């Protein structure tokens, strides 16, 4: 298929510099795509601003019908989407088909229903002779920046609530992994009125900055790194735009001596290495109580070393490559820094694999200390550290000693302990005896430098609205 931008309901070629898109499993170029020019970014935003006058006044039913049509279209083209995502990201094809595509379809269907349930919280006479009511209205033009780790899923998380609430959107996928977003554009063209949804392609410095800084953009939604979030906040601060930030994580996984160690080890094997560890909620920072530390290290070593790396199209592949050569170099540097510490033990993995593609072996680093960079910084790869702790107070202090605040988990059979820690952990989500589980009905989002705002759930829908007070004198 031809990959084009969607601007004002028309598929067009980019007018900017051409960029190569790679297959990370082979390191080979898939194709080249031209970026949007500044004039095309301007045209997309102006089209969205013009379309908002009508789209923002449509009924929730009408918006829901469009979202349902898009969900149906994605479902009908599931295999093509999955193949594109697998080819462009290196994800195991069966994971995209069985895990990601159904979740993406569900997000659009959830927000189609949620659009029809959005309402204000109060109506009444709070002043004699006056009736007050609360409205939740759309914001206007939303600029959405999607990341490279889950390109289509993160696009869905941003598009569905924004469109459901009555906003118009200009979305820019990562220049590393744009193919599924551009495929989505081709489907959306015949579903939404012109200008309601616009899809651009390009780098942050050439397209993203022009988009987020445009005077007609009222809100910017980003999933990305802390550095990118800081840049966008500085860039948009003079205009005081509404912002929604999901900026990564370093999830603590606290395993107490009464936990089911087999379940914990298998949980980390699955939840720490899914998508090659390129997940903001990955179970990557393990704390094990002293009494079970050695046993858990052994179980984790066996579990992690059994992960099968391979070609994305192979049904038995559990771990694919990292998304880019640049990211492979970042992960390698982080692990080499950890390995240089005399107290770190490499239980398994620890290096790039031989051969083509951007593969890094699943890695378990034992005896990490709280102050180590491998514990404090997000690696965003198939790398898990494990640290011993003595008691509840110590591990709570260590778990919260992080600039991140997205996700965490506690593994214990003590219900009281689970409740105590979940109440005090400074994370947007805490799982008990599991990790990584997300559903459309529940909010996902962080605190501290992991950002603010919620994806999914009714809270996510509300983030794309303005609360307004209307008062009538009578």
UniProtKB/Swiss-Prot annotation:
<dbReference type="InterPro" id="IPR029510">
    <property type="entry name" value="Ald_DH_CS_GLU"/>
</dbReference>
<dbReference type="InterPro" id="IPR015590">
    <property type="entry name" value="Aldehyde_DH_dom"/>
</dbReference>
<comment type="function">
    <text>Catalyzes the oxidation 4-aminobutanal (gamma-aminobutyraldehyde) to 4-aminobutanoate (gamma-aminobutyrate or GABA). This is the second step in one of two pathways for putrescine degradation, where putrescine is converted into 4-aminobutanoate via 4-aminobutanal. Also functions as a 5-aminopentanal dehydrogenase in a a L-lysine degradation pathway to succinate that proceeds via cadaverine, glutarate and L-2-hydroxyglutarate.</text>
</comment>
<dbReference type="Pfam" id="PF00171">
    <property type="entry name" value="Aldedh"/>
</dbReference>
<feature type="binding site">
    <location>
        <begin position="172"/>
        <end position="175"/>
    </location>
    <ligand>
        <name>NAD(+)</name>
    </ligand>
</feature>
<keyword id="KW-0560">Oxidoreductase</keyword>
<feature type="binding site">
    <location>
        <begin position="146"/>
        <end position="148"/>
    </location>
    <ligand>
        <name>NAD(+)</name>
    </ligand>
</feature>
<comment type="pathway">
    <text>Amine and polyamine degradation; putrescine degradation; 4-aminobutanoate from 4-aminobutanal: step 1/1.</text>
</comment>
<protein>
    <recommendedName>
        <fullName>Gamma-aminobutyraldehyde dehydrogenase</fullName>
        <ecNumber>1.2.1.19</ecNumber>
        <ecNumber>1.2.1.-</ecNumber>
    </recommendedName>
</protein>
<dbReference type="GO" id="GO:0019477">
    <property type="term" value="P:L-lysine catabolic process"/>
</dbReference>
<feature type="active site" description="Nucleophile">
    <location>
        <position position="280"/>
    </location>
</feature>
<dbReference type="InterPro" id="IPR016163">
    <property type="entry name" value="Ald_DH_C"/>
</dbReference>
<dbReference type="GO" id="GO:0051287">
    <property type="term" value="F:NAD binding"/>
</dbReference>
<dbReference type="InterPro" id="IPR017749">
    <property type="entry name" value="PatD"/>
</dbReference>
<dbReference type="InterPro" id="IPR016161">
    <property type="entry name" value="Ald_DH/histidinol_DH"/>
</dbReference>
<comment type="pathway">
    <text>Amino-acid degradation.</text>
</comment>
<dbReference type="InterPro" id="IPR016162">
    <property type="entry name" value="Ald_DH_N"/>
</dbReference>
<dbReference type="InterPro" id="IPR015657">
    <property type="entry name" value="Aminobutyraldehyde_DH"/>
</dbReference>
<feature type="active site">
    <location>
        <position position="246"/>
    </location>
</feature>
<feature type="binding site">
    <location>
        <position position="280"/>
    </location>
    <ligand>
        <name>NAD(+)</name>
    </ligand>
</feature>
<dbReference type="GO" id="GO:0019145">
    <property type="term" value="F:aminobutyraldehyde dehydrogenase (NAD+) activity"/>
</dbReference>
<keyword id="KW-0520">NAD</keyword>
<feature type="binding site">
    <location>
        <position position="209"/>
    </location>
    <ligand>
        <name>NAD(+)</name>
    </ligand>
</feature>
<comment type="subunit">
    <text>Homotetramer.</text>
</comment>
<feature type="binding site">
    <location>
        <begin position="225"/>
        <end position="228"/>
    </location>
    <ligand>
        <name>NAD(+)</name>
    </ligand>
</feature>
<dbReference type="GO" id="GO:0009447">
    <property type="term" value="P:putrescine catabolic process"/>
</dbReference>
<comment type="similarity">
    <text>Belongs to the aldehyde dehydrogenase family. Gamma-aminobutyraldehyde dehydrogenase subfamily.</text>
</comment>
